[in-house]
Amino acid sequence: MLDRSQRGSRTLTLIVALAASLALAGPAGALELITEAESRLPPALSGMPRGGITLGPGIVVVTPSPDRDVRAPFAVKVNFRPHGGSKIDASRVKIIYLKRPAVDLTARLKGAISEAGIDLADATAPPGTHDIRIDVTDDAGRTKSAVVSFTVVK
């Protein structure tokens, strides 16, 4: 049996844990795509690595649109297009927030990634412009990258 101080301590621990989990969930259970601390990191150095000329998978960004500001929560929808009878290897998709140091968002988005693309109904990010690189590899080992830039407003 717990004494009064142990019960109080345990209750406080549960309240703090619940508050932390609710804070991470964002508005109405939306996935926190980018944290406030991550958004304050310095921008990545410009330039993307260049590969050889191959017909890697196509990457089509549906939302968020780079030419329109978004408000949180917002949808993230990206379609992958395989070529030449190949299939997308969803386990090799990488999603990187382009900051210094780079922030790997892949694990955060794991449930939204499939062979068809990325489909996330509700994401949040702090206000500002964000650049995310998506690397997609097919079962023939061909990789294609695309950078998604979007601006979140209050």
Predicted regions mapped to residue ranges:
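Short, compositionally biased P/S/T/A/G/V-rich stretches that sit at domain boundaries
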Residues: G29-F74, R81
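Surface-exposed, short loops/turns at beta-strand junctions within beta-sandwich domains
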Residues: D122-T129
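Solvent-exposed loop/turn segments flanking beta-strands in beta-repeat/beta-sandwich domains
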Residues: H83-K94
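Aromatic sugar-binding surface patches on proteins
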Residues: K110-D119
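Edge beta-strands of extracellular beta-sandwich domains
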Residues: K144-T151
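Bacterial N-terminal signal peptides
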Residues: T13-A23
